[in-house]
Amino acid sequence: MGVNMTIKDELQLKPEELKKCCSLDAYTFETTKDLESMVGIIGQDRAREALDVGLNIKKKGFNIFVAGQWGSGRTTFVNEYAKSIAKNEPVPEDIVYAKDFQNFHNTIAIRLNAGRAKDLIDKVYETISFLRKEIQNHFISKEYENAKKQILIEHKKETKEVLEELNKIGALYDFEFKQSEKGIVSIPLSDGEPMSEEEYNNLTDEEYEEMKENSEKLQVESADLFNQIRNIEKDYRDSIDDLNKSMGERIVKYNFLELRNEYSENNSVIKYLDALQEDIVKHINEFINNDNDVKDNPMMLFKNKDSERFFDRYKLNLFVDNSELKNAPVVFETNPTFQNLLGSIEFTVEMGVKKTDFRYIKNGALHRANGGYLIVLAKDILSNPFAWRGLKRALLDEEITIESMSSSYSVFSASSIKPEPIALDLKVIVIGTPRIYHILANYDEEFGKLFKIRSDFDQQNDRNDKNILKMAEFISKYCRENELRHLEKDAVAHLIDYSSRMVANKKKLTAHLKTISDIIVEADTIANREKTDFINSEHIEKTLNRRERRDNKYEEAILELFEDGTYLLDVSGKKVGEINGLAVLSTGQHSFGKPNKITVSTYKGKAGIINIEREVRKSGSVHDKGVLILEGYLGYKFAQDKPLAFTASIVFEQLYGGIEGDSASSTELYAILSSVAGVVINQSIAVTGSVNQRGEIQPIGGINEKIEGFYKICKLKGLTGNQGVMMPIQNVKNLTLKDEVIEAVRDGMFSIYAISHIDEGIEILTGIPAGELEEDGQYPEGTINYLVNEKLIELGSDDTNETEDEEKDEEQSDSDE
């Protein structure tokens, strides 16, 4: 690779390359107040297209999983987008639960056009209330009393005839039969007259036994007549019941006629009304209430209470009421428990026993969203495993079955009911992270069958004119909706630049709008304190500084350790086998760069590169891989004509918490080359970058934090104008450095070099060209590669002689044999 003496000048970045400054001069607005509120979302074309496909496919299984990071606006957008689709779709039906009069453990579901359920409930209630009075009035009417009197006369006549027959037989045994309130009773006679109590008590044993014997004979001979009396009594009761039912049926049918005509097109309503009328007629006696009985007998109060409870069977449960909707529902369930999703059966406790009926059936989000769209957060529903399983079962079965979970875990028994399942026709949208999606896709068998559409939200968007304007409109919308001060144009530009810094890419904007909105809220408090009408760029900068100040306690503690010399680091001078590497530390909300001294010792041996971090189990697998790549590079570069025989121990000094990643692999390689060649490295320059076996520099992460971290240390120890950072050229697009660092570069007090190959880096660090392999297979004398190659020959020379001696000994042994 050809390298000239101006390589530092060629590879040094200009100040304008360190950050892309947003200019809004082409836009006509002065503040975000001049802009319309954003409609839709910034970017996310892929996610929007997938969402559109999923929402418009109405087949089973085409539910949607929205994968994106929290704070990206995914939930708000999905909610709004679903509503935009739903507004063109019809309002689903109302649902009413009613008692199943054929099977008291079941309930029936009645579906009606939206808004009709309340009307049905009101009219059924009015009809029942009217019937309770109307039936009572009819059953105290002269018509009813006359009909009942005729039945009673016939009953008495038949009873009298049988009674006369009984007395004929009774006279033979000195007994007489009389009608009483308790029925027909037998009375012993004495001289043809009813026996008095005194006469009864004075009976001798013989007389008593004789009377007893006569009574038994009479009982046998009169059995048929008593059966006749019982049949007469039964016929009487049946006649009264028939009278009541006949009259009741006529009254009920007449009073339900109008209601039946009104709902004649709804078969489920007509079917229910038929069963309702039949049940009323069947229990017509419950409607015939004698208020005098209650007044005369206080104990009848309890019976009256039970009677009132009886009429609960005719009430209706307004299960789903869509009367207020104008289109298909969009339900966002924030607490998707089993009951909140699939509904529940509540209960009352009487004497320690749980009781329930159809009136206590409560709907769930699936019922309210039926015919439309249900939105839930994955983290919420997966934290309720019963709810997740219940949702999947409902989607697979295409119906919602309401069950009471509490009965399985309660010490009380509960009256059980079985609500009729509701047919399910809706679209479910689950919002989660990509990680949750992959877990479900790999480990949940039903997930792929039920959620066939994935809407993938990016973490970043292109930084183009369209999205910049969208960002400004988002800011306008957020300020307007939350009654905050609007932003001046320079404040918007500042946020655009910070948005790029959040994703460490000049060509991108963050999709994490929650952070942007939080900054606006905080900046508004500063603007309020300063009594300005709008938020300006200074307010944004102060906010960012305050946010960093809140979270950088650990970083400041690290800086103090560098300042007082606890951490050893040279930012000037030159040393052999020592170099400053760069790492990124994170405390959750805050990430920052921390320089680390890396040292290498080389000596004779065959161990190759000894990674001390690995030996003490302080390095991760990726870092270990990076170190092994170094051996590959050295072998590729210097061991084509000889064995690579040397030992180099490499360590991150004063590192006690472990290390992971390969971003320091090029840094380690420079230190090895310096140690082997015996050439000093400029300690003013810190290095970051990965390297492959061919010496090509590869990009890394956290470039802004690393550069700023080393800059802060140099500032602490004193800027000299020679300090800087060497980085991969591929990371130039990721540079969004703070203005302070950019100004230092502009003033010539700090430098940043972007390289693509190890040969470029070693020349910048040592001032000596790397040297390219010539035609004779040698490196030019005086170059780094020449010095390294010569030293490796020297380190491996004893091993070569030893190998030759061993070969001679083997040949001598063969000749002796």
Task: Give a label for each model feature.
Residues 2-441, 446, 452-464, 468, ...:
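Conserved ASCE/P-loop NTPase catalytic core
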